[in-house]
Amino acid sequence: MKMVAPWTRFYSNSCCLCCHVRTGTILLGVWYLIINAVVLLILLSALADPDQYHFSSSELGGDFEFMDDANMCIAIAISLLMILICAMATYGAYKQRAAWIIPFFCYQIFDFALNTLVAITVLVYPNSIQEYIRQLPPNFPYRDDVMSVNPTCLVLIILLFISIILTFKGYLISCVWNCYRYINGRNSSDVLVYVTSNDTTVLLPPYDDATVNGAAKEPPPPYVSA
């Protein structure tokens, strides 16, 4: 008996560095988990000691607040949610539970859509980049150097940078999606196609042999009345 799984023909089971999509998804989930854990630690330390991350109006070059307590709490909640989503994706890929990967995949789609909107905004409104740079504080690193660049060249550089990011994010999305399909296909027993041979065919004797053997039997003894 030979089993053929059709879901193995329509997509690749390998990603970068020739590793399996499950391994790639686990590594990606752990990487996002570490990043969000570091961000959460920074936010918690900033919330515990506001003076350590406090910037005065002279340092910022304007009369606005860097981050208040409400925004800090929102950022902490988002970091906790991201840690939960990344942990679910890592656990789902490790334990081969496809449903646990869906939240992380939805986050990837949402992040890709936001970056696409940024690229469209830069392409449609190229002057918005110069306006955004002018609003930065005067002591912002490399502000004057960026302002001195030709606006057209600056737009092209930013679009090229965003295109590279979108390509990389799209590749990561495909890796996670292939991992979901792989796990979902392995857990579905009804998608397997069973290929069998004729080894179980029942061979019946020829009709002539059956009738001859039946006729050759001795007749029953005669009936004797009492």
Swiss-Prot record:
Transmembrane feature ranges: 26-46, 72-92, 100-120, 153-173
Keyword check for Lyase, yes or no.
no
Tell me which Gene Ontology terms the entry assigns under biological process.
Answer: endosome organization; endosome transport via multivesicular body sorting pathway; negative regulation of lysosomal protein catabolic process; negative regulation of transforming growth factor beta1 production; regulation of lysosomal membrane permeability; regulation of lysosome organization
User: Is Ribosomal protein one of the keywords?
Assistant: no
Alphabetically sorted, this entry's keywords are: Cell membrane, Cell projection, Endosome, Lysosome, Membrane, Transmembrane, Transmembrane helix, Transport, Ubl conjugation
- Where does this chain mainly localize? membrane
Q: Name one GO molecular function term.
A: ceramide binding
Region described as Required for NEDD4 interaction: spans on this chain: 205-221
Q: Tell me what topology the record assigns in the membrane.
A: Multi-pass membrane protein
Instruction: Check the record and name the Pfam families matching this protein.
Output: Mtp
Compartments, record wording: Endomembrane system; Late endosome membrane; Cell membrane; Cell projection
- PTM comment text: Undergoes proteolytic cleavage following delivery to the lysosomes.
Gene Ontology terms: cellular component: cell projection; early endosome; endosome; late endosome membrane; lysosomal membrane; lysosome; multivesicular body membrane; multivesicular body, internal vesicle
Q: What does this protein do?
A: Required for optimal lysosomal function. Blocks EGF-stimulated EGFR intraluminal sorting and degradation. Conversely by binding with the phosphatidylinositol 4,5-bisphosphate, regulates its PIP5K1C interaction, inhibits HGS ubiquitination and relieves LAPTM4B inhibition of EGFR degradation. Recruits SLC3A2 and SLC7A5 (the Leu transporter) to the lysosome, promoting entry of leucine and other essential amino acid (EAA) into the lysosome, stimulating activation of proton-transporting vacuolar (V)-ATPase protein pump (V-ATPase) and hence mTORC1 activation.
Assembly: Homooligomer; upon reaching the lysosomes. Interacts with MCOLN1. Interacts with NEDD4; may play a role in the lysosomal sorting of LAPTM4B; enhances HGS association with NEDD4; mediates inhibition of EGFR degradation. Interacts with PIP5K1C; promotes SNX5 association with LAPTM4B; kinase activity of PIP5K1C is required; interaction is regulated by phosphatidylinositol 4,5-bisphosphate generated by PIP5K1C. Interacts with HGS; promotes HGS ubiquitination. Interacts with SNX5.
Family listed = Belongs to the LAPTM4/LAPTM5 transporter family.
Q: What is this protein called?
A: Lysosomal-associated transmembrane protein 4B
State the organism of origin. Answer: Macaca fascicularis (Crab-eating macaque)
